[in-house]
Design a protein with these regions (language model features):
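N-terminal topogenic module of multi-pass integral membrane proteins
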Residues: 1-55, 183-196
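Physicochemical signature of membrane-embedded alpha-helices that form the seven-helix bundle of GPCRs
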Residues: 3-10, 31-35, 57-64, 90, ...
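Hydrophobic cores of alpha-helical transmembrane segments in multi-pass inner/ER membrane proteins
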Residues: 7-18, 63-78, 119-126, 170-187
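Membrane-interfacial loop-to-transmembrane alpha-helix junctions, especially the N-terminal start
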Residues: 24-36, 81-93, 132-143, 190-196
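Aromatic-anchored segments of alpha-helical transmembrane domains
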Residues: 35-45, 94-105, 141-154
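Membrane-interface helix caps and helix-loop-helix hairpins in membrane proteins
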Residues: 49-55, 102-113, 156-163
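Membrane-proximal helix-loop-helix units in multi-pass membrane proteins
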Residues: 58-128
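C-terminal transmembrane-bundle signature of multipass membrane proteins
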Residues: 130-196
Length: 196
C-alpha cells in the first residue's frame, strides 16, 4: 500500500468510526463523515492502482466537498435542529445541497466546491470557539489546515518534509474530524446519570 492510499485508509477508518457511532444520535455528523469516508474508500482503491474508480472517487470527493462539511457544520452548530437530528432532513440536504453543488461545479462554477466547505469551516471554527472545548478548537483548526492544503498544495509540495499535499490533506482531515466529532463530556455524563 502506497503512502497516498494509506492516508486515505486512515481517513476512511476515522470517518467510518464516526459514522457508525453517531448514526442514530447525530445523523448530520454521521452522514457528513460517511460521505467523506466513501470518497476515502474510493481513494484507497484509486491510489492502490484500481484505475476504474478514478471517476467515482472524483465525484464522491466533489459531493463530500459540496455537502459533507455543510452537514458537519449544521450538526455541530445547531445540534437540536431537524437538520442535525432527523435522517430525512439529512437526506434532503444531501440531495438538494449536494445536487446543486455538483451541478454548479459541472456547469463551470468550480469555486462552489471550495466556497461551501470554506463557509462551513468558518461556522465550525466559530462554534468551537464559542463552546471553548479544546478538542473542538484543535479539530476546527486542523480542518481549516486541511482546506489550506487543498487550496494551496501543488504536486511536489512536501509538508513537514515528509507528507505530500494529498497525504497532508487526508491526515489533517482525519484528525480534525476525529476531534470535532468527540461528544461533549458533560453531555455524556448527563446521558449516563441515573434519573433523579
Amino acid at each position: 500500500m502506497n503512502p497516498d492510499a494509506l492516508s486515505d485508509l486512515v481517513l476512511l477508518l476515522v470517518c467510518a468510526t464516526v459514522a457508525w457511532r453517531d448514526l442514530r444520535t447525530r445523523p448530520a455528523i454521521a452522514v457528513g463523515a460517511g460521505l467523506i469516508g466513501l470518497a476515502a474508500l474510493l481513494g484507497v482503491l484509486r491510489f492502490s492502482g484500481v484505475a476504474m474508480v478514478y471517476g467515482p472517487h472524483r465525484f464522491f470527493s466533489l459531493l463530500a466537498a459540496c455537502v459533507a462539511f455543510t452537514l458537519l457544520a449544521a450538526g455541530l452548530r445547531w445540534p437540536d435542529a431537524a437538520i442535525a437530528r432527523r435522517a430525512a432532513a439529512v437526506g434532503r440536504c444531501v440531495v438538494v445541497v449536494g445536487g446543486v453543488g455538483v451541478a454548479l461545479t459541472v456547469m463551470g462554477v468550480g469555486l462552489w466546491s471550495q466556497i461551501v466547505p470554506g463557509l462551513s469551516a468558518l461556522v465550525i471554527v466559530w462554534t468551537a470557539l464559542q463552546q471553548r472545548r479544546a478538542p473542538a478548537i484543535v479539530g476546527a483548526l486542523l480542518l481549516v489546515g486541511s482546506f489550506a492544503v487543498a487550496a494551496t498544495g501543488k504536486p511536489g509540495t512536501l509538508y513537514l518534509d515528509y507528507f505530500n499535499s494529498t497525504q497532508a490533506l487526508h491526515y489533517l482531515l482525519a484528525a480534525g474530524i476525529a476531534l470535532l466529532a468527540l461528544p461533549r463530556l458533560s453531555a455524556q455524563a448527563d446521558a449516563s446519570a441515573p434519573p433523579a
